[in-house]
Structures are given as structure tokens and as C-alpha cells.
Amino acid sequence: MKIKVIHGPNLNMLGIREVNLYGPMKLEDINKNMEAFAKQNGFEIEFYQSNHEGDIVDAIQESLNENVDGIIINPAALTHYSVAIRDAIKAVNLPTIEIHMTNTAAREEFRHKSLISDIVAGTITGFGPFSYHLGLIAMIQILNEIKMAKEAQAKAQAQANKQ
């Protein structure tokens, strides 16, 4: 199974910008850690980062043609105003987890509202780079449960066909 991780604006600057908020870990290191954990659990993982809303919308939509089973997304600042990203997530109808490294509820008022939190499977905030790891654990669990449900349904259908 395949998971796509989408990083929004300014996340390419991790380890450089606002280290007091986001810590010293670079995006490449977060991706390497996630890749290792995904492989240990038998999952394929791919990463995408853009500072542009339309490109992120394209990346979400392209998930359907790439046989992606689930999306982990940190929309960053776009969380708070991108109806386009919200609509793209709804359109692809894939299990999606929203990630934020900082606790957005403890930050500026404008960061308190997420336009996607009500349409995703869950939201993980405030654990720094570990937020991504927690999101990956959650996504693996969700996808394994979906797989088991499909297998059980297929088994039940096969038994029903025998009768």
C-alpha cells in the first residue's frame, strides 16, 4: 500500500526558520525517518513539498492516478484559508490525516481555524517533527483496518457464492 505525504508552504525551510517553534530538524530528515518506518511496516511512501496552493491541489488530485491509498498532509499556512485544498481532499475521498508540528490552538488567533480538520480522519498537532511519525502510525493503522475489512468482505462474499 502507498502513502503520500504532502508538505505545504515554508516547510522546505525547516531547520532554518523559527527553530524556536519548529526545532532544528530538516524536512529531509523527517522524510528519511518516515520512509524507514513505512518500509519496516511494508508500506510505500512518497513525499511532495510545494509553496504553491495550486500545486498542492494538483498533488492531491494526482493521488488517484498514482494508486495512493492514504494522504498525510501538513498544509501549513494554507490550512487556515484554502478552500481549494479542502475541496481537493474531499474530491479524492482518500483517508487523510492533517499534521501540524506546532500546537496551532496555542498560537495566533488566525491559526486556530482549520478548513480541513472536519473532513480528515484526524488531526495531529503540537509534537514537533514527531507529529509526522504519529500521523504515519495512524495512517498505517487506518489502511490496515481497511485492508482487513476488504479481505473479510471478500471472504464472506466467496462463502455466500458457494451456497
Swiss-Prot record:
The active site is at 22 (proton acceptor), 100 (proton donor). Substrate binds at residues 74, 80, 87, 101-102, 111. One of its GO terms (molecular function) is 3-dehydroquinate dehydratase activity. GO terms for biological process: amino acid biosynthetic process; aromatic amino acid family biosynthetic process; chorismate biosynthetic process; quinate catabolic process. CDD domains: DHQase_II. Keywords: Amino-acid biosynthesis, Aromatic amino acid biosynthesis, Lyase. PROSITE patterns: DEHYDROQUINASE_II. It comes from the Bacteria. Catalyzes a trans-dehydration via an enolate intermediate. Homododecamer. This is 3-dehydroquinate dehydratase. It comes from Nautilia profundicola (strain ATCC BAA-1463 / DSM 18972 / AmH). The gene is aroQ.
